[in-house]
Swiss-Prot record:
Belongs to the type II topoisomerase GyrA/ParC subunit family. Residues 34-515 form the Topo IIA-type catalytic domain. It catalyses: ATP-dependent breakage, passage and rejoining of double-stranded DNA. A type II topoisomerase that negatively supercoils closed circular double-stranded (ds) DNA in an ATP-dependent manner to modulate DNA topology and maintain chromosomes in an underwound state. Negative supercoiling favors strand separation, and DNA replication, transcription, recombination and repair, all of which involve strand separation. Also able to catalyze the interconversion of other topological isomers of dsDNA rings, including catenanes and knotted rings. Type II topoisomerases break and join 2 DNA strands simultaneously in an ATP-dependent manner. It comes from the Bacteria. The gene is gyrA. The keyword ATP-binding applies. Keywords: ATP-binding, Cytoplasm, DNA-binding, Isomerase, Nucleotide-binding, Topoisomerase. This is DNA gyrase subunit A. GO terms for biological process: DNA topological change; DNA-templated DNA replication. One of its GO terms (cellular component) is cytoplasm. Its main location: cytoplasm.
Length: 825
């Protein structure tokens, strides 16, 4: 052992790591992960097919055990684990993995459900018919052979490949620092593209796409949109969307609809897909599905999704596409080896490299065949002369003492012959070559019959024509391209089939809003921070003084604090107690029943400790001419442009810098010309002009809006309109309507006037809203009881009155929220 390291070389570890890793990376790139652009195969696939070729494991021969093939591959050509080789064989035999299978398998080779193949000792394989086109002309010196890993065998550096395998079967692999993901295509279309390129190598991409419109996956499906295809074909990189194919079936008995999926996207595991759908239904992320079954059999795929009678199949379908692998994005990255170097290729470049490869193969094949044909023609020429002079030749052979002497006598003699026009000589003198003499000496006696003589002449004539044709192919590129074209047409006729994947013009980008049904909803936020929305249609209008319906199941110490009526597609601006604004879509909130309490908003927004949402504002559209007007409990107001809040951030943005112990109580949209009304819990109100407050930046603190007493605070912010009245409600369930004209316009920062007479009976103000006759209002108590009342049923009273009963509350029950509903039901 002491003699193993006789010399130690000191090297810099950084340089050694760099050099060694680079060697490893190139080994993976060239020798394992990336296909060659010429035959579309990685080394392992090429070695598998060559090993089967050596074994004569052809499509028209008997199957051989997979283990036999694996053993030959790893023993002779591929010094890696048997599982890596067998996994490659399995994939080459799966009709859902390769568009055109290269191996014909017998036995269990796995399934689209992700089931593993049987062990290689149980399965049998042979080459498929099309795979032999990859190896055609291999024995005609068409490709170079290189030593195997130990130098005991030789393997082809590349396969001759008559088929454009890189495109028709695609390829995927991850190397070091790069990856490839080439989708499969239809053979007919790819060959049509090749023929068009042969006809005009200056063909444009747009013209080429007329022949090759896009990928064609073995699992069919639908490709949505052509933009990604064109981008990938032009640059080598792009993204396409593959969608499952479905149909809607209606049950004749119960009239319920079912969505039937009978084609799924490429490389999607069907079993996991069904599990995901079931999980989404269980989590109630998809509502409306009543049953889910896999009815797939030997005749085809069939995934059945039964939906509720009242559910809309289009919405559920879009939700399934968005949330599951029923629609996937396929990233195209056409990287392949070109002359041993990885390169990102366009569609046109791939065709160019393949056809250049075919030209090289046809050239080498023609040279090989020409040499072989010329040698045979030379022999036939000698035999023809010998048959003319057969008697003389026989005499020489008889006189010779040995075969060597006979050969020398025949070579030295000058021969005279007739029919010279069939022999390429200028005169009648002829001298045999050594090869010709050997053929003459090997000639059997039965060849001397007249019939055999005619056969030799006919064969010679055929060879002469073949030599002429081969020389023409080698001299003329046009003729060579004709040969390539004819071979491609033959491949198309023998193996071409119909396209499976449909390509549509539809926009593949499914926005979440496309999946959500537009409907008016009630959004509630409890004092403890539980938020939810539920359809507005869940509530019917009641008479004044009714007991109401339960709007939320809440804990005894919790109560509903905020309630807004909005639409599922609107934006909710959530203003926190710290003056931070958070941006959400209504549909991002949890949808719950009336009896559910919803979800904690802290799970939806990144709120910090002791931070809570104090105001929510629904926004339908962010318009530049609108403002956000804010009011705090201490009477501070601030106006900022709505466009300041257009771009959300995950962590939120500053809406207002609050003073100590202050918080937001109201937010409203204004146009710069409105009036502003601030109502306090002790029954005060001030109305002033909006233009008395200048527009400020998001981080400003604001200005004084109303002067308040020590034990008072602002509870409502209203932007009034001329035709509306103000409805004021108290925590004991009292309320009234008062005309807006009864509230005088004062200067900003004054104490204001009386809005409602506060007594022990009616309690303090919990809120004020503006209403018209056709409006309805909602009131909610801290016990979770909700009542819906028509505004027209509430009397119009003067400012200095205490109001009438709007909702009857039980002991310790207080009204905590008030909201207007614009459109009555």
């Amino acid at each position: 052992m002491k003699h193993l390291a006789r010399e130690i070389v000191q090297v810099d570890i950084e340089k050694e790591l760099k050099s060694s890793y680079l060697d490893y990376a190139m080994s993976v790139i060239v020798g394992r992960a990336l296909p060659d652009v010429r035959d579309g195969l990685k080394p392992v696939h090429r070695r598998i097919l060559f090993a089967m070729h050596v074994l004569s494991n052809y499509w028209n021969k008997a199957y051989k055990k997979s283990a036999r093939v694996v053993g030959d591959v790893i023993g002779k050509y591929h010094p890696h684990g048997d599982s890596a080789v067998y996994d490659s064989i399995v994939r080459m035999a799966q009709n859902f993995s390769l568009r055109y299978m290269l191996i014909d398998g017998q036995g269990n080779f796995g399934s689209i459900d992700g089931d593993a193949a049987a062990a290689m000792r149980y399965t049998e394989v042979r080459m498929s018919k099309i795979s032999q086109e990859l190896l055609a002309d291999l024995e005609k010196n068409t490709v170079e052979f290189i030593p195997n890993y130990d130098g005991t065998e030789h393997i082809p550096e590349i396969l001759p490949s008559k088929i454009p395998n890189l495109l028709i079967n695609g390829s995927s692999g991850i190397a070091v620092g790069m990856a490839t993901n080439i989708p499969p295509h239809n053979l007919n279309e790819v060959i049509d593209g090749c023929l068009a390129y042969i006809k005009d190598d200056n063909i444009t991409l747009r013209e080429l796409i007329q022949h090759i419109p896009g990928p064609d996956f073995p699992t069919a499906g639908i490709i949505n949109g052509k933009k990604g295809i064109e981008e990938a074909y032009r640059t080598g990189k792009g993204k396409i969307y593959i969608r499952a194919r479905n149909k809607i079936e209606k049950n004749k008995k119960n009239k319920k609809e079912s969505i039937i999926f009978y084609e799924i996207p490429y490389q999607v595991n069907k079993s996991r897909l069904i599990e995901k759908i079931a999980e989404l239904v269980k989590e109630k992320r998809i509502d409306g599905i009543t049953a889910l079954r896999d009815e797939s059999d030997k005749d085809g795929m069939r995934i059945v999704v039964e939906i509720k009678k009242e559910a809309m199949s289009e919405i559920i379908l879009n939700q399934l596409y968005s949330l599951t692998q029923l629609q996937i994005s396929f990233g195209i990255n056409m990287v392949a080896l070109c002359q041993g170097q990885p390169k990102t290729l366009s569609l046109k470049e791939i065709l160019k490299h393949f056809l250049s490869h075919r030209e090289e193969i046809v050239t080498r094949r023609s040279i090989f065949e020409l040499d072989k044909t010329c040698k045979r023609s030379h022999i036939l020429e000698g035999l023809s002369i010998a048959l003319i002079n057969i008697n003389c030749i026989i005499d020489l052979i008889k006189k010779a003492k040995s075969s060597l002497e006979a050969k020398e006598l025949i070579i030295k003699k000058t021969w005279i012959y007739k029919n010279s026009e069939k022999i390429n000589q200028k005169d009648h003198d002829y001298h045999f070559t050594e090869e010709q003499v050997q053929a003459i000496l090997d000639l059997r006696l039965h060849k001397l019959t007249s019939l055999e003589k005619n056969k030799l002449v006919l064969e010679y004539d055929c060879l002469t024509k073949k030599i002429k044709e081969l020389k023409k192919i080698l001299k003329s590129r046009d003729r060579m391209r004709e040969v390539i074209r004819d071979e491609l047409v033959s491949i198309k006729n023998n193996f071409g089939d119909q396209r499976r994947t449909e390509i549509t013009e539809n926009n593949p980008d499914i926005s979440i809003e496309d999946l959500i049904n537009q409907e008016d909803v009630v959004v509630t936020l409890s004092h403890s921070g539980y938020v939810k929305y539920q359809p507005l249609s869940d509530y019917n209008a009641q008479k004044r003084g009714g007991k109401g319906k339960s709007a939320a199941k809440i804990k005894e110490e919790d109560f509903i604090e905020s309630l807004v009526v909005t639409n599922t597609h609107d934006t909710i601006l959530c203003f926190s107690s710290r003056g931070i604004l958070y941006w959400m879509k209504v549909y991002q909130l949890p949808e719950s029943s009336r009896h559910a309490k919803g979800r904690p908003i802290v799970n939806l927004l990144p709120l910090s400790n002791k931070e809570r949402i104090t105001a929510i504002l629904p926004i339908h559209e962010f318009k530049d001419n609108l403002n956000i007007f804010m009011a705090t409990a201490q009477g501070i107001v601030k106006k900022s442009s709505l466009k300041e809040f257009k771009k959300p951030r995950i962590a939120g943005i500053i809406a207002i810098n609050l003073r100590a112990n202050d918080e937001l109580i109201g937010v409203s949209l204004t146009n710069g010309k409105n009036n502003i009304m601030l109502f306090t819990q002790n029954g005060k109100v001030v109305q002033f002009l909006e233009n008395s407050v200048r527009t400020m930046g998001r981080t400003a603190s604001g200005v004084r809006g109303i002067k308040i007493s020590k034990n008072d605070k602002v509870v409502s912010l209203i932007v009034p309109y001329k035709k509306e009245s103000i409805l004021i409600a108290t925590n004991n369930g009292y309320g009234k309507r008062t005309k807006i004209t009864d509230f005088p316009i004062k200067s900003r920062a004054t104490q204001g006037v009386i809005s409602i007479k506060i007594t022990k009976k009616n309690g303090k103000i919990i809120g004020a809203i503006q209403v018209v006759e056709k409006d309805q209002i909602m009131m909610i108590t801290n016990a979770g009881t909700l009542v819906r009342i028509r505004a027209s049923e509430i009397g119009v009273l003067k400012r200095n009155t205490q109001g009438v009963i709007l909702i009857r509350t039980s002991k310790n029950e207080k009204v905590v929220a008030l909201q207007r509903i614009v459109e009555p039901i």
